[in-house]
Amino acid sequence: MGYARKVGWVTAGLVIGAGACYCIYRLTRGRKQNKEKMAEGGSGDVDDAGDCSGARYNDWSDDDDDSNESKSIVWYPPWARIGTEAGTRARARARARATRARRAVQKRASPNSDDTILSPQELQKVLCLVEMSEKPYILEAALIALGNNAAYAFNRDIIRDLGGLPIVAKILNTRDPIVKEKALIVLNNLSVNAENQRRLKVYMNQVCDDTITSRLNSSVQLAGLRLLTNMTVTNEYQHMLANSISDFFRLFSAGNEETKLQVLKLLLNLAENPAMTRELLRAQVPSSLGSLFNKKENKEVILKLLVIFENINDNFKWEENEPTQNQFGEGSLFFFLKEFQVCADKVLGIESHHDFLVKVKVGKFMAKLAEHMFPKSQE
């Protein structure tokens, strides 16, 4: 009896063990199959384009026989979009998948053409994807296609007439930095058109706030600065940035070289407009601004900054502004320029400081500043 019971327990153990092994086998086999499906662009539940005609994600495919990587769009696993500190994807293979997604969007919009320039009907399909999709990698691929086409003048009117401006601008509300950057690039390319600028002005405050609050030196911040620079090429919309000039000087002082140069392009647009002179002089500037005039700073940065100061000096009318000097608070650009002699002495007094051109520019600017903006007889 005892022997039979023992055999029964052993048999039960074998059955349970076999069942467990089978379950593990099924589980691992299922995971493997899922991965293979994702790698091969399996149909899956990835229909993300709603009722938009022809915009079915699981219908996208690339039938080129020359390349195995262009079979179809690849679904991103959840971990593929984990960002690093720089806002890029952590896994290198995600970049390759994004490339395949972009090709699939192009193929879907224009299946019979390898040309990157899309027709109005094809642009409508891409805009439909942007409007209906919630998948970041689909949005990114579609926005890249739009941005490339928005670089052509004839397409800017077409995209606007198709209702593309508000569709792309809506993407600015996303929290995904990669998608947001691509949306800003599209709007930047579209903003070269005067009529597009008129319609995009309603988004300037949002773009300005997002640019200032974005992570310092990030791709989103640079894309936002480029869009704002394009929007301020003419004087028509510059006044909308008047309350943010202090923030731009803060970005200039704290940013890296690329950020500094982009901020300078924006400030130069404002400085060329006499109507913005008072707003620029009223802006609060960081105390560290003077430290930029040292031998370690990029020469191009210093020369561009001097051009901005010269424009402000040329547009400033002492006789008109003398009674209102008290409107310029302590720490403003007005008082920085008034005390600029200290910075100039550092540049002119060190033989090893920069090159001859910088010294000449600083010397000429100091002479103009003393003659025009702060004449000694008036101090």
Curated annotation (Swiss-Prot):
Mitochondrial intermembrane side of the membrane: what ranges? 1-6
Spans annotated as Mitochondrion outer membrane (MOM)-targeting sequence: 1-6, 26-37
List membrane-spanning regions. Answer: 7-29
Provide this UniProt record's keywords sorted from A to Z.
Cytoplasm, Membrane, Mitochondrion, Mitochondrion outer membrane, Nucleus, Phosphoprotein, Repeat, Signal-anchor, Transmembrane, Transmembrane helix
Record membrane topology: Single-pass membrane protein
What is the protein's quaternary organization? Interacts (via ARM domain) with MIRO1, MIRO2 and TRAK2. The interaction with Miro is calcium-dependent. Interacts with SOX10.
Name used for this protein in its record? Armadillo repeat-containing X-linked protein 3
